[in-house]
């Protein structure tokens, strides 16, 4: 599920809810990106909070039990996003995702 992030009539980013596992797990993974010129304005934490509310609580949403956000350890901006929304750190997934030609750890 993909949503566009818009600011003053301009598309500035994207947020998605993927890897949705229904049934007994009821989990999903949130992913996002934002244009460099719009980073740091609070748009991404707002989008994450809105998507989380919809995915977890809204009767029209998938009514998930758990959401994950996976980031590369050195991505400080993404780390700030997850801190602002109150996400809990659970550890490192070693060689979790293939990014730019190499297997990368994610937190």
Give residue spans per PLM region.
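Acyl-donor (CoA/ACP) binding surface of acyl/acetyltransferases
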Residues: 2-107
